[in-house]
């Protein structure tokens, strides 16, 4: 019984960590991955969820571009890969009723991966990922109370980049030979 409580506490603490906290630890390569270009965009019919604050296409594109550049420009593998990111929908939590109704922010986006050397699209179809704002002590109040709209956008974009990295690490694409020619 005690180990279950300890394990639950450990999971809770892990969920409370920042999406950029791992920047402080040693970088573990993703095979031969090196970021080529990021092509962020927001769907022409970007879906704003119910009871959400409003965010523009431009705000999402800028936040996603910055978060993905920060996360993926750290990798210096031997082959370039390009990431296409499309924001499809979001909910930016408004203030709710603390503890009783604490709305969560959500981001839905799709990712495609293109290998630079061959020009081949590695994803058969765009891979959809949904991120929900991280669990924090302040989540009991709801991020609508504790975070500005801009902070919510940036936090979701950082979580999107982290979720994409986690997904990329499970793919077999980055085990081939290096293709970058150093002159």
Which residues does each predicted region cover?
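Sec-dependent bacterial lipoprotein signal peptides
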Residues: 1-17
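A structural "domain/chain start" motif
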Residues: 16-62, 173-183
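C-terminal/domain-edge helix-coil "capping" segments
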Residues: 17, 140-183
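Second-shell loop/turn segments in exported
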Residues: 50-59, 97-99, 142-151
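N-terminal, post-signal-peptide region of Sec/Tat-exported proteins
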Residues: 53-78
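A beta-strand/beta-hairpin structural motif
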Residues: 65, 127-132
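Sec-exported extracytoplasmic/periplasmic mature domains
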Residues: 69-73, 77, 92, 161, ...
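Surface-exposed short loop/turn segments
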Residues: 75-123, 134-146
């Amino acid at each position: 019984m005690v180990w279950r409580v300890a394990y639950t506490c450990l999971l809770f603490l892990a969920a409370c960590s920042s999406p950029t906290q791992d920047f402080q630890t040693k970088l573990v390569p993703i095979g031969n991955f090196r970021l080529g270009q990021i092509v962020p965009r927001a769907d022409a019919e970007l879906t704003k969820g119910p009871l959400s604050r409003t965010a523009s296409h431009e705000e999402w594109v800028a936040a996603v571009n910055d978060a993905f550049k920060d996360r993926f420009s750290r990798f210096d593998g031997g082959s370039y890969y390009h990431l296409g990111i499309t924001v499809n929908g979001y909910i930016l939590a408004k203030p709710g009723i603390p503890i009783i109704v604490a709305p969560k922010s959500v981001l839905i986006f799709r990712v495609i991966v293109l290998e630079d050397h061959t020009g081949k699209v590695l994803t058969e179809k765009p891979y959809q990922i949904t991120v929900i704002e991280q669990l924090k002590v302040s989540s009991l109040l709801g991020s609508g109370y504790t975070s500005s709209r801009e902070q919510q956008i940036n936090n979701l974009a950082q979580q999107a980049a982290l979720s994409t990295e986690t997904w990329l690490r499970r793919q077999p694409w980055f085990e081939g030979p290096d293709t970058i020619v150093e002159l």
